[in-house]
């Protein structure tokens, strides 16, 4: 630690950023425009000084590519600090030096209670030494790894503070670009402190950035596909990954290889555990693949879930999103919350009774009746596999909506990735320190079986990678991340274009049967999954009507199959003159007169629509028409025309009936 500079009055507040006009000066000049600056600024020293005279160095907090971070105590004041030492001889890439200096300038310019503060900077020809705020509780990563699952109140506490800090950065024109659990620290009071601005940069709304950096597990679709981006949208995506991890205790995107991870992120495909959480709507909004539809930091800060239980919102700004997504997401979240509370109350009153088959079918039908945009944000049924955004225009029949046997479903998913998480990502990601960790027990291991933690069965169905990584291969949150990579390293075009998505398996016969039965028209009433006695009167059922077994045999056309399930063929025949609307209004009785005229089940206006009365005599008679004449009775006469002409209409109807006879 020898050779650092001593404080000297009048020192210029620069770090040797180069001659006028150089790229370094441009970086310094840009960051100097940040407002507001700290009241007293950051001391920068370039004169020889021995830091050991001022600070008592203690244990090492973390090691990085260019040096290490140590805890230290200032001898004069007793203040505990973190000292980050960077060796210049290990910096081979000029771009890395630019990032280090940019980090110092940006962090020195930001003043927020949830962002790590820089107190002093020392530099000589060999080293750059940064004296910064010390966060005694360590990384949020370790905090979650020890507890596996946080309460919603604690999750909201952490996430509000993270959003507050990110909103402050965006408000001052700074995008972090490397938000992850390892870069979020906790102080003595378990308050958030965001660190590591090594990949941060200034942004402007009318300009695009093209540096593809960050951690792959938190990278947005724009980053992994090498598309230009403005900046804040990549932080919004990372916030979605963070919130998912805080809520569920695992990572949303857990591809076990390069190609799979790229596909998952590009399609926004992630597992959504079935344990209820009111934050799932906000998570989906932040993990929208289209950056124009993705929640902005203002949308997140004003979301009801983030501010639930607090007197004020995270920020006093207005949401800038023009789409209907915020309102829709709020309505859907409220619906889920109210439905869940009502279900819990009913379960307690009924002695925790299980839902009946009819209730499950009703819930599935409700989910299918939702609009396309609402289905994009929420799923009402836990047993329904949602459609991918590319297939929203073509609705799937209910017959192929399969129940998930592993008590999980996927959000924005078109397939399910089977198998255990395999090897870590290849070296192209430069993320050895982010993919595996050995210091924490796997939930599936016997040693991890402790009360209050996930059972082995639950662990087997959740992503095996989770957030467990190797301690020795991961840098400290105080340290700059060397994970910058170009688009050519992150993606081979054939990987995305050539990747295939598993198609859903064909439905089984039982599922097809249930689908067909549920498609009957509204005139047929169902009670407890069985048709009413009046509808299924044995006298009404023709002995010649095909059975389910006969319809499933070869040679029966598909058209006949659909007709037979929905109604008797005599009712829905193309040649029939019976009004389907009038038929639906019938109240079939057990005992009816032996003979009634056809007007009891026919609307007069149906006959008035027929122009060619003579042609009716040559048309084939509807099947089973005589049987229905004998059985149907006492129905009201439907007449939608002007009531003043009722006599004339009635006479015309009688004339038509006589021609039919």
Curated annotation (Swiss-Prot):
Active site: 178
Gene Ontology molecular function, alphabetical: ATP binding; metal ion binding; p53 binding; protein serine kinase activity; protein serine/threonine kinase activity
Principal subcellular localisation of the protein: nucleus
EC code: 2.7.11.1
Domain Protein kinase: 55-306
Subunit structure: Interacts (via GILK motif) with PPP1CB; the interaction is direct and bridges NUAK1 and PPP1R12A. Interacts with CDKN1A.
Entry protein name: NUAK family SNF1-like kinase 1
Upper taxonomic lineage: Eukaryota, Metazoa, Chordata, Craniata, Vertebrata
């Amino acid at each position: 630690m020898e050779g650092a500079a001593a404080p000297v009055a009048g020192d210029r507040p620069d770090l040797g950023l180069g001659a006028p006009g150089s790229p370094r000066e441009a970086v310094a000049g840009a960051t100097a425009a940040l407002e507001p600056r700290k009241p007293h600024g950051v001391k920068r020293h370039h004169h020889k000084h021995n830091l050991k005279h001022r600070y008592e160095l203690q244990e090492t907090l973390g090691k990085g590519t260019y040096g290490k971070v140590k805890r230290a105590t200032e001898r004069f004041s007793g203040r505990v600090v973190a000292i980050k030492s960077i060796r210049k001889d290990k910096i081979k890439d000029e771009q890395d030096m630019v990032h280090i200096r940019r980090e110092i300038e940006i962090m020195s310019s930001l003043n927020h209670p949830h962002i790590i503060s820089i107190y002093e900077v020392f530099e000589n020809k060999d080293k750059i030494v940064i004296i910064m705020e010390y966060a005694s509780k360590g990384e949020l990563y370790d905090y979650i790894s020890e507890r596996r699952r946080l309460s919603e109140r604690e999750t909201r506490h952490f996430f509000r503070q993270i959003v507050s800090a990110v909103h402050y950065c965006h408000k001052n024109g700074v995008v972090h670009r490397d938000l992850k659990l390892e870069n979020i620290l906790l102080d003595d009071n378990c308050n958030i402190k965001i660190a590591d601005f090594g990949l941060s940069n200034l942004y402007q709304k009318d300009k695009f950035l093209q540096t593809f950096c960050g951690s792959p597990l938190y990278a947005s679709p724009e980053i992994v596909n090498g598309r230009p981006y403005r900046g804040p949208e990549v932080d919004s995506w990372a916030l979605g990954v963070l919130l998912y991890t805080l809520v569920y205790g695992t990572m949303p995107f857990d591809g076990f290889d390069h190609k799979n991870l790229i596909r998952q992120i590009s399609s926004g495909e992630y597992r959504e555990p079935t344990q209820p959480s009111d934050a799932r709507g906000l998570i989906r909004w932040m993990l929208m693949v289209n950056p124009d539809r993705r929640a902005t930091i203002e949308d997140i800060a004003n979301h009801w879930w983030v501010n639930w239980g607090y007197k004020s919102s995270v920020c006093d700004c207005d949401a800038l999103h023009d789409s209907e997504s915020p309102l829709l997401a709020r309505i859907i979240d409220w619906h889920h919350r109210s439905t869940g509370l009502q279900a819990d109350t009913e379960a307690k009153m009924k002695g925790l009774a299980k839902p009946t088959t009819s209730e499950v079918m009703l819930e599935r039908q409700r989910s299918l009746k939702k609009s396309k945009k609402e289905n994009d944000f929420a799923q009402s049924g836990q047993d329904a596999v949602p459609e991918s955004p590319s297939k929203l225009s073509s609705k799937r029949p209910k017959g192929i909506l399969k129940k998930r046997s592993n008590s999980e479903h996927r959000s924005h998913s078109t397939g399910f990735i089977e198998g255990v998480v395999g090897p870590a990502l290849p070296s192209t990601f430069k993320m050895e320190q982010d993919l595996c960790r050995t210091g924490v027990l796997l939930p599936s291991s016997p040693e991890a079986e402790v009360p209050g933690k996930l059972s082995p069965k639950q662990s087997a169905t959740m992503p095996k990678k989770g957030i467990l990584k190797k301690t020795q291969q991961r840098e400290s949150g105080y340290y700059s991340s060397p994970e910058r990579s170009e688009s050519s390293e992150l993606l081979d075009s054939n990987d995305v274009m050539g990747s295939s998505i598993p198609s859903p398996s064909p439905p089984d016969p039982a599922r097809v049967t249930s689908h067909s039965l549920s498609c009957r028209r509204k005139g047929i009433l169902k009670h407890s999954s069985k048709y009413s006695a009046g509808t299924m009167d044995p006298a009404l059922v023709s002995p010649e009507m095909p059975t389910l077994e006969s319809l499933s045999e070869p040679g029966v056309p598909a058209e006949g199959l659909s007709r037979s399930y929905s109604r008797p063929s005599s009712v829905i025949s193309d040649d029939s003159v019976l009004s389907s609307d009038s038929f639906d209004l019938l109240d079939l009785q057990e005992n009816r007169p032996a003979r009634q005229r056809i007007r009891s089940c026919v609307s007069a206006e149906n006959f008035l629509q027929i122009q060619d009365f003579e042609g009716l005599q040559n048309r084939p008679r509807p099947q089973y028409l005589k049987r229905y004449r004998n059985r149907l009775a006492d129905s009201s006469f439907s007449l939608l025309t002007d009531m003043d002409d009722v006599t004339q209409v009635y006479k015309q109807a009688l004339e038509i009936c006589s021609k039919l006879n």
